[in-house]
Amino acid sequence: MTGDDLEGLTFAAEPDEALSGWTVVVSAGREGDAYAGALDVTASATPSETAVTLTVTDRNGKPWSATTPTLTAVQAPVTAIDLSRDGTANCYIVSEAGDYMFDAAVRGNGSGDDAAIALADGMKADWLWVTKGLEQEISAVSLDAGKGRIFFTAAGAAKGNAVIALADAAGEIVWSWHLWFTPEPRRVTYANGRVLLDRSLGAVGTTPGSAEAYGLYYQWGRKDPFCGGTAPETSATAFAQAAKNSVVNPAFADTHAWKQESGAAVSTLEYAAAHPLSFLSNKGATGVYDWLAKPRADLWNTAKTCYDPCPVGYKVPDRDTWDDFADDQDRYVDGTSEWDGEKYGMTYIFGDLRDWYPTSGYRNRDKGNLAGLATTRTGHYWSNYRSGNTISCFYISKKLSTGKLLQPQSSSKSDAAYGYNVRCCRE
């Protein structure tokens, strides 16, 4: 290209479609009256082919060339870490900054006849809620339906939790995934051969006495995590701490909030998937509380299901996982237990291993309020076992007024509507 006025040139790239993050890089040099150079145009949006019109103007604002070449710019693909490369799940661990993606066309681990998600025009993805303070931790959430992937960027500066939701064209949530922003959990091998993560699902630390070790709460058979707190709640104040400790995306805030709902109309799998922030409760004829009007015993199982909340390679534990936590309050078959009255919890000891189980309470089966955090400290950890209305969990309790440690129970019975912690076990 040559011209009479070659200094102070301005290059503008205008894509035919609206793409954010375009940059123009110019490298050039003068040779006599000629001005030679190269123009690189790079877009940072989802990879696509886009027609680009290049306009060159001189320092007086006049077109430098009467012709405007039309180029086809092929955006270089963003290198994103595929969290689902080793398998899919309802939870993915994020331990460092970077660009990420995961399979959006599969529910959970893909098991079962209803695990596939049909991605359609008009669908979109965005974060639903995040731990308060993590609003800037997750960004650039988008769905690439053609690739069947959801993309996002993690800043890597904070610890906590987030949920990404996939919504249809009408804004209804189709499915959602939990992002667990935590240092990579340590794997703890018990004497019975079971390998468990060293923290509750959703916990961002393991220090005894720290609320970072509390983790999230789950109703039996649901994949959806519920935020907790450090103090008991009444029925009237249920989810006050969840609302305080998290932020709901304004894009969803008109239709989604932490709350309790009951009744047959909302007690279905479909409603639960579409309302991840709703704590569901349905009282059966026998007085047993379930979040389903028609209870199912196969939502969690010995073989991991598409409703299991654990990360890739892990599942909700079998009920015999804690059998070695025997009747003896002080010493177990494969190790010892130490109750910490100031930090409220038990440390499982086996050789050089230490595994902290906090008494982080639970969410009540009817109104969803936090309990077990006052005069009696309790810890509840779900197993995957259910037979009829009998559901097993690992249970710890300490009556603070007397200092009496109530016997740890490796297979305590409970209702599915309760919100308990989960300690994930390797498949």
What does each of the following model-derived ranges do?
Residues 39, 47-59, 158-169:
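A short beta-strand micro-motif common to beta-rich folds, especially ectodomain repeats
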Residues 30, 34-47, 145-159:
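Extracellular/luminal low-complexity segments enriched in Ser/Thr/Pro
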Residues 76-304, 387, 416-427:
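Short, compositionally biased
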Residues 2-9, 19:
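Extracellular acidic loop/turn motifs
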Residues 59-67, 170-175:
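Short, exposed coil/turn segments at beta-strand boundaries within extracellular/luminal domains
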Residues 67-73:
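Terminal edge beta-strands and adjacent linker/stalk segments
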Residues 163, 203, 277, 282-427:
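C-terminal, surface-exposed recognition/capping segments
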